[in-house]
Structures are given as C-alpha cells and as structure tokens.
C-alpha cells in the first residue's frame, strides 16, 4: 500500500455495535451508504482499512465501563456481513 494516497478507514462496524451487545441505531442507518462507498472505493483501487475493537477478556479495563463486547474471535467482534471484508482489505485490531 502506498502511503501517499487516500484510503477509506472503517472503524468498529462490528456486530456488537450495530446489532449486538452495544447496538447503536445510528450505526444501522449508515450501513447502506457505507457499503456503497466501500464498493466504489474497491472498484477505484482505493484501499479499505477496517480498524476494529478486539478485546481480550481479563485484560481490557474497558469492560468495567461497558461490559463484555467485541471479544477477539467472537461473532460480536466480526465486521457486519453487509460490509464484507474483501480479500485485499486490511484489518487492524484495536486491543485497548
């Protein structure tokens, strides 16, 4: 990936934040437009980067505030199916 060109950064569009443990109604509302943007970006060769919560039980203090969510490897920590991580996309886990 060249570092001198634009990219699309998608943050925390995960099952737990859109339909699960910490669902946000506004998150659901942006899904169609986000999916269309990602399709257009990929078609144009613009890199797509997903930056996602991937918490580790027993380590992450965020659970004290919000309860368990987006646990690494769980269904809740997966990108929502409507946005489909592509084979050329990048996925960056956020641990804390």
Segments the model singles out, each with a brief description of its role:
Residues 1-91:
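Active-site acidic carboxylates
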Residues 93-96:
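Short beta->alpha junction loops
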């Amino acid at each position: 990936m060249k570092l001198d060109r634009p990219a699309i950064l998608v943050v925390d569009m995960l099952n737990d934040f859109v339909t699960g443990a910490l669902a946000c109604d506004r998150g659901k509302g942006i899904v169609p437009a986000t999916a269309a943007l990602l399709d257009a970006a990929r078609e144009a060769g613009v890199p797509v980067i997903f930056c996602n919560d991937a918490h580790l039980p027993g380590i992450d203090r965020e659970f004290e505030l919000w309860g368990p969510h987006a646990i690494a490897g769980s269904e809740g920590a997966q990108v929502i199916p409507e946005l489909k991580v592509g084979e050329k996309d990048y996925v960056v886990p956020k641990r804390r």
